[in-house]
Amino acid sequence: MLAAVLGAVALYTFIGFIPGTDETSVLAPVTLALVLSGAPPQVVLSFFVSAVVTLNLMNGIPTALVGLPGGVMSAPLMEHSVLLRNRGLASDTIRKMAVGSAIGTLVSIPLSFALAGLIARFAEPIKAQAPLILAACAVLLALLGRNRILALVAIVPMALMFEALPALYHATHIIPADKKVSISFFLGITVGPMLVTLLELLNPRRREALPHGDRTRTALLRSGFRSQALMPGNLVTRSEGWWSTAMAALSTPLFMLSPVGLTFLLGEASVARMKDDPVRRSQRAVTVMSALTHSTYLAGVIIPLVALGFPVSGVSAGPAMPLFEAPPVYDLDHQDRKSTRLNSSHARLS
């Protein structure tokens, strides 16, 4: 188990530095390979949790330093990270992200296991109504945003597209009828803005409107690396710590909602009244959002896996899907108890 944890830290430390990565594309294949290798479910879960913590933490570095989203979960932090970078506070931003990540992890893991114990008794009704619950969560998340009507309307074409693409693949025999296809649209959250920016360079007017000047001078400072300065209590203010703790705890029971959406909504809610000082506002936002990136992701895999044994969240149906379905080791198609106990990581963990 320790080897799996250390391996995840080593691997995703390097992957996390690469901007624009998709969590599903970098977490799911390695997790699937580990499951198919015959590793015990406790080892696989430890690996996955370690990978999530490391990846989300390292994704904050390119976000803070160069203004590029390290991953899908870094997208909500972009605006505040760029503002702080322009003020010369990139190194402070990385430290605040690290403390926020630690807070989110420490709050979410025990709370997720506690909630899983409470929800386990309602597992069968939740499984039976999973499609309706997920649809209701999508509507709720749309209503919590600013452009409510547009968000509600957008659900329909997105749902049609996700149903139409597998049907098209089966109809054209690209994929056999008895096989499944998984669609991950999360990569578009990070790659989409980059592609739009590159396409804008083809427009002469847009190109001329871009800032032009000399080379940017960069200086690396050693300030803030004293042992006392690296204490968590000196890196974040008391309000930033309390807001991070509160929002991480609040997001954990909402594990069925989108982790990106929760990170943005709850993170912005924590700074809604801070309009006078943009720097302090952004510092609190990056701290709270870093806590939320960890709490939402960890709750999204721990609670469905431990309590339900069925993917009912975006995380469990995406990056963590090999923990639920990885034939022939884990198979959701087996409905009877004997088969379920033989083919379920949920049963082996319980």
Whereabouts are the PLM-identified features?
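Transmembrane alpha-helix interface/packing and boundary motifs in multi-pass membrane proteins
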Residues: 8-23, 55-67, 141-145, 248-257, ...
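Transmembrane-helix bundle segments that line or gate the permeation/cavity pathway
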Residues: 106-117, 121, 128-215
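Single conserved hydrophobic/aromatic residue that forms the stacking wall/gate
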Residues: 342-349
